């Protein structure tokens, strides 16, 4: 613990907490200050000046990052018949119906993404208390309730991320790994930023992006100047 604290102090000394860095500077600092012994994830965080209590100011969706996330996604699909075969052919890790519902209700959660065809939502709905709090419940807004299961599986395996503003207007997203080349992290960051900018509600007041930052797992939070994106 003492060693980790020493590493954190050293990392903090390299970052000016009062400064908003350009995206290129921020990415370079994330890589420079990372001290994790594993290939740490790189995440961005947005504090948006929105009121999620208003229906037209709720921000939620999905996108495919240009350079992927660097994370292997375990994809589970609820489908039957031809759609189940499509999902398997596309690379889904788990495909089933009631058998998967029983398994999940029994405590099994070894998957990262859940996709379902519309006709399967009646049985998937039984898992609301399990999947909902973990942000795993299939939803049309994120493209995880669909008849095109092959495309959904391929996108999930190829770098698709989902995002959602919490009650305080915060949005977090994985944009890659510390091992990524800096230019690939910058490209992913800019792609996500474009999505956030376009998601601005017409009724939002004041400065939309109150704060933007980037960090790595166990790393230092670094403020980013939105204008550099």
Swiss-Prot record:
Pfam families: Ribosomal_L1
Family per record: Belongs to the universal ribosomal protein uL1 family.
General function of this protein: Binds directly to 23S rRNA. The L1 stalk is quite mobile in the ribosome, and is involved in E site tRNA release.
Assembly behavior: Part of the 50S ribosomal subunit.
Protein name in UniProt: Large ribosomal subunit protein uL1
Species assigned in the record: Streptococcus pyogenes serotype M1
Keywords associated with the record: Repressor, Ribonucleoprotein, Ribosomal protein, RNA-binding, rRNA-binding, Translation regulation, tRNA-binding
CDD domains recorded: Ribosomal_L1 (cd00403)
UniProt keyword tRNA-binding, yes or no: yes
GO molecular function, one term: rRNA binding
Alphabetical list of NCBIfam families matching this protein: rplA_bact (TIGR01169)
Repressor in keyword set: yes
GO cellular component annotations of the record: large ribosomal subunit
Gene Ontology biological process: regulation of translation; translation
């Amino acid at each position: 613990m003492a060693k980790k604290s020493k590493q954190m102090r050293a990392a903090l000394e390299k970052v000016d907490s009062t400064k908003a860095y350009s995206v290129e500077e921020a990415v370079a600092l994330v890589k420079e200050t990372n001290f994790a012994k594993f290939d740490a994830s790189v995440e961005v965080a947005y504090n948006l000046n929105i009121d999620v209590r208003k229906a037209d100011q709720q921000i939620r969706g999905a996108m495919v990052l240009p350079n992927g996330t660097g994370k292997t996604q375990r994809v589970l699909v609820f489908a039957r018949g031809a759609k189940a075969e499509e999902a398997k052919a596309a690379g889904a890790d788990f495909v089933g119906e009631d058998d998967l519902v029983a398994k999940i209700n029994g405590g099994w959660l070894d998957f990262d993404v859940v996709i379902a065809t519309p006709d399967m939502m009646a049985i998937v709905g039984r898992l609301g208390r399990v999947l909902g709090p973990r942000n795993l419940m299939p939803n049309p807004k994120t493209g995880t309730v669909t008849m095109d299961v092959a495309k959904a599986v391929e996108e999930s395996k190829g770098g698709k991320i989902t995002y959602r503003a919490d009650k305080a207007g915060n949005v977090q997203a994985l944009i890659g790994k510390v091992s990524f080349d800096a230019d690939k992290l910058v490209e992913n960051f800019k792609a996500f930023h474009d999505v956030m900018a376009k998601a601005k509600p017409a009724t939002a007041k004041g400065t939309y992006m109150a704060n933007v930052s980037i960090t790595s797992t166990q790393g230092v939070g670094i403020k980013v100047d939105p204008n550099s994106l």
